[in-house]
């Protein structure tokens, strides 16, 4: 039986070598697809890790609409915020509009409450996207389907980055070798709700207007910060089917590298790319450069979502800002797991691009 791998084994191995040895597909070649072009994009923040009192944010590139302290017409209803992320995306190309839900937060109750307050019409949703296999991004999904499947279109597809989105996740316990459950997405429940599953390890166009990066190539200084561990086994029909990884892990949980994490992107007419990195375990610079590579476009208009920099020290944040300044996006909107350190650094060093985010905000690009 192979020996269990520790985190050092993962850090000394290149992402490409690790992916090959563990049975994962590598990043796609450059310019493998023609990316669609849109005229307008609305991003509604349905679930985020913080909520602040509404305050104005000025940017010539994006219209920012902040929700008040309570729902319109009923002061008793207010937003619920929690650790996690869920976004409603509405894009428009010409006269055609498309509506997608990207990630689903930690709990169904918060997601459903905020969907209602932010006036998201489930009947118009044309697709679902899951960024990666962490519970705080899919926790609200099954409950949403159980409660409101009849409101959603009959033909509904969930686009996930790859097979490892369905692996069982665990977290380290109080004693060495002990682990506690941290969720697993059961594809049987998706099938029971008549949701078609499409895995997207390669770049994929979604609903004619969005596209995903596919597997994110890891070429920058960035590293995956310690997070969950992965159990690659199948138990009672639940889990992920990656035989090479299961064999190599030897039945032991191994540090999570999120090799099937992907970002959701749009190409905005005359502006450039909008890159949405829901959690950014792969690195926000890596994710953005992968989007640029897939689309064959150097101009990035906006980067938003989770950057997963709350564990980062000052040197790491400083290097991240250097790389972001080199990419030179017009707008930067860190959310969820990005951390107060990054927000402070961007406010200080990229004040014209930085837009602070809070739960219940709508961002409109292309106006």
Predicted regions and their residues:
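Conserved beta-strand hairpin/beta-sheet module of binuclear metal-dependent hydrolase folds
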Residues: 50-52, 58-118, 257, 261-276
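Active-site neighborhood of phospho(di)ester-bond hydrolases with catalytic His/Asp-centered motifs
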Residues: 101-104, 126-133, 160-161, 275-279, ...
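N-terminal secretory signal peptides and thylakoid transit peptides that target proteins
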Residues: 1-18
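Active-site-proximal loop/helix segment associated with metal-binding centers of metalloenzymes
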Residues: 180, 205-266
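C-terminal segment of N-terminal export signals and the immediately downstream linker at the start
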Residues: 24-44
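Active-site metal-binding motif and surrounding structural segment of the metallo-beta-lactamase
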Residues: 109-159, 294-304, 328
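Binuclear metal-ion centers of metallo-dependent hydrolases, dominated by the metallo-beta-lactamase
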Residues: 192-199, 322-367
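Active-site-proximal loop/helix segments of hydrolase catalytic cores
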Residues: 111, 247-298, 305-308
């Amino acid at each position: 039986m192979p020996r269990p791998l520790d985190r050092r084994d993962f850090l000394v191995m290149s992402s490409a070598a690790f992916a090959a040895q563990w049975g994962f597909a590598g990043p796609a070649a450059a310019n493998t697809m023609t990316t669609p072009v849109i005229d307008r994009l609305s991003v509604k923040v349905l679930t985020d890790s913080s909520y602040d009192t509404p305050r104005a944010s000025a940017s010539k590139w994006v219209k920012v609409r902040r929700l008040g302290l309570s729902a319109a017409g009923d002061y008793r209803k207010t937003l619920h915020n929690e650790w996690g992320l869920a976004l409603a995306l509405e894009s428009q190309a010409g006269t055609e509009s498309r509506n997608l839900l990207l990630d689903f937060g930690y709990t169904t109750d918060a997601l459903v409450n905020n969907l209602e307050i932010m006036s998201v019409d489930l009947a118009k949703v044309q697709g679902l996207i899951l960024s990666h296999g962490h519970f705080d991004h899919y926790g609200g999904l099954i409950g949403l389907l159980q409660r409101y499947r009849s409101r959603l279109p009959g033909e509904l597809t969930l686009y996930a980055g790859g097979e490892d989105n369905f692996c069982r996740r665990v977290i380290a316990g109080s004693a060495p070798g002990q682990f506690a459950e941290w969720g697993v997405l059961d594809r049987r429940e998706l099938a029971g709700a008549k949701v078609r599953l499409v895995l997207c390890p390669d770049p994929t166009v979604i609903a004619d207007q969005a596209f995903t990066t596919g597997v994110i190539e890891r070429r920058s200084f960035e590293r995956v910060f310690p997070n969950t561990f992965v159990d690659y086994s199948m138990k009672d029909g639940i889990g992920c089917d990656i035989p090479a990884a299961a064999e190599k892990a030897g039945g032991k949980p191994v540090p999570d590298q999120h090799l099937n994490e992907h970002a959701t992107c749009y190409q905005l007419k005359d502006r450039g790319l909008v890159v949405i990195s829901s959690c950014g375990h792969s690195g926000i610079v890596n994710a953005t450069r992968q989007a640029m590579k897939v689309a064959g476009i150097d101009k990035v208009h906006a980067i938003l979502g989770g950057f997963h920099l709350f564990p980062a020290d000052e040197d790491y944040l400083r290097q991240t800002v250097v790389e972001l300044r080199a990419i030179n996006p017009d707008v930067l909107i860190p959310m969820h797991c990005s951390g107060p350190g990054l927000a402070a650094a961007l406010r200080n060093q990229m004040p014209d691009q930085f837009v602070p985010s809070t739960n219940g905000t709508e961002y409109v690009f292309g106006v």
